[in-house]
Curated annotation (Swiss-Prot):
Annotated catalytic residues: 333
EC number of the protein: 2.1.1.-
Molecular function GO terms recorded: O-methyltransferase activity
Species name: Aspergillus terreus (strain NIH 2624 / FGSC A1156)
Protein name: O-methyltransferase tazO
Chain sites annotated for binding S-adenosyl-L-methionine: 288
Function: O-methyltransferase; part of the gene cluster that mediates the biosynthesis of azaterrilone A and other azaphilones, a class of fungal metabolites characterized by a highly oxygenated pyrano-quinone bicyclic core and exhibiting a broad range of bioactivities. The first step of the pathway begins with the non-reducing polyketide synthase tazA that assembles one acetyl-CoA starter unit, five malonyl-CoA units, and catalyzes a series of Claisen condensations, methylation, PT-mediated cyclization, and finally releases the first hexaketide precursor through the R-domain.
UniProt pathway: Secondary metabolite biosynthesis
Induction info: Expression is positively regulated by the azaterrilone A cluster-specific transcription factor tazR.
UniProt GO BP: methylation; secondary metabolite biosynthetic process
Keyword list, A-Z: Methyltransferase, S-adenosyl-L-methionine, Transferase
Gene label: tazO
Length: 435
């Protein structure tokens, strides 16, 4: 029998869960949540904050449920269809014109001053920002003036947030508008060019999203999308719940002793940097497109002797043999099964006996609604993004293991670990050369 959910019952849950979260934050000497500009831009991460993460998730789940129940069936639908497209449009204007930079962190600025700097009429600035304010992005401290809130100030506190949002609104949003058309014409294809973004931007047969972002633009501007994507990934790597911190506890890095880790498709090296800080015996080689080599300049001076960069096409055999660990963090979810198997095959020529391959990625549930809906939504958002952008599927644990088996019989899955407070899992694979 389905349990009856009531407003009163949910309200009691929200009150109890809010009290629990507040108590845990106070015990950890952490500030209470706030809409003010000085609010922490992200919740605390790490194993020591697992109870806080669990309490936060429970509260979000109940708060979302009471909102949806109060809305009712039709308003639940129209809240999406009527509002979200304009929410995205307002946010797109805000990031494209870099409006957060025009507002002092602890002051105010007039709509007229913003209009003068962005170059379009004040009445349009007013309409766009007033709509954003209904999502707590900026506030109006007095008529005619704009001030920061926590969400709008997050762009100042974490500049790469703008890159991540711009990528989603410039590219993913456009691709989403082509999803229905794509499903009608090539819904069963595993080819990257047959994705929704391939249709939105006119990819040639055989071309991938990665080809597109590496080559778009002319002269010095060539590859600007690739550079923006790399910066955006820094934002997601530092944010919850797919933070790189889950890697610290999901695998025994210290137990490797002095070892070499290949960060396959490691972008700007943000994950290698954090792991290098935590594990001083490890050396890292970041592999990615040649165009990202300049990001090595951003490696802290004290780590440059332990972090290097190599150009590597993951669709070709890996050129760095005999390392101890090959890390694929948020890589294979970008590819259909056909290509995920190929990428794992391409590691084999480089692997020594006993080498580890770590797949750090999202594992979809075997069944829908197998956990908190808020956490499941994070998984399905990722799944939709991968389908739209790269024609890749969501994979359950069984699906992931099947991909590994298809790649090479000498691969053996040793462990699958999902740290508390994260939507990411780590699949540890051992290569047995004599198997």
């Amino acid at each position: 029998m389905t349990k009856t959910i009531t407003l009163e019952g949910l309200a009691d849950q929200v009150q109890a869960q809010a009290s629990t979260l507040s108590t845990l934050l106070a015990e950890a000497n952490l500030p209470s949540p706030s809409f003010g500009p000085d609010a922490p831009p992200a919740p605390p991460h790490g194993k020591e904050f697992e109870k806080i993460q669990a309490a936060r998730m429970a509260l979000i789940e109940s708060a979302n449920a009471i909102r949806d129940l109060a809305l009712g069936p039709e308003d639940c639908i129209t809240a999406f269809s009527d509002g979200i497209k304009h929410d995205l449009a307002a946010l797109h204007v805000i990031v494209d014109f870099n409006i957060p930079e025009l507002v002092p962190l602890h002051g105010e600025v007039s709509y007229a001053e913003i209009a003068q700097k962005v170059g379009f009429p004040e009445y349009r600035v007013h309409r766009i920002l007033r709509h954003a304010m209904t999502s707590r992005i900026f506030r109006e401290p007095r008529p005619g003036y704009v001030a920061h809130t926590g969400p709008s100030a997050a762009f100042l506190r974490n500049p790469v947030l703008r890159d991540w949002v711009s990528f989603n609104l410039d590219e993913v949003w456009k691709a989403d508008t082509k999803l229905v058309e794509t499903l009608r014409t090539c819904g069963d294809s595993e080819e990257p060019a047959d994705s929704a973004i391939g249709r939105a931007f006119g990819f040639a047969p055989g071309k991938t999203y990665w080809d597109f972002i590496a080559n778009d633009g002319e002269g010095e501007n060539k590859g600007w999308r690739q550079r923006r994507f790399a910066q955006g990934m820094k934002c997601r790597a530092a944010g919850n719940p797919q933070t790189h911190h889950h890697l610290h506890s999901a695998f025994d890095w210290a137990g490797l002793g002095k070892a070499t880790v290949i960060d396959v498709g490691g972008s700007a090296g943000h994950v290698s940097i954090e792991l290098a800080k935590a594990f001083p015996d490890l050396e890292f080689v970041v592999q990615d497109f040649e165009g990202l080599k300049s990001f090595h300049d951003g490696v802290p001076d004290e780590l440059k002797s332990r972090i290097s960069f190599e150009a590597q096409d993951i669709l070709q055999p890996n050129a760095h043999p005999n390392a101890d660990v090959y890390l694929l963090r948020s890589i294979l979810h970008d590819w259909s099964d056909k290509y995920a198997v190929l990428i794992l095959k391409n590691l084999v020529p480089a692997l020594k006996d006993g080498a580890r391959v770590l797949i750090a990625d999202f594992i979809g549930p075997e069944n829908t609604q197998s956990g908190p809906m808020w956490l499941e939504r994070l998984s399905t958002i990722r799944s939709m993004q991968m389908m739209t952008m790269v024609n890749a599927p969501e994979r359950s644990e069984k699906d992931w293991i099947n991909v590994v088996k298809r790649a090479d019989s000498r691969y053996s899955v040793k462990a699958v670990v999902t740290p508390a407070g994260t939507a990411m899992s780590v699949i540890e694979i051992v290569f047995n050369a004599s198997a």
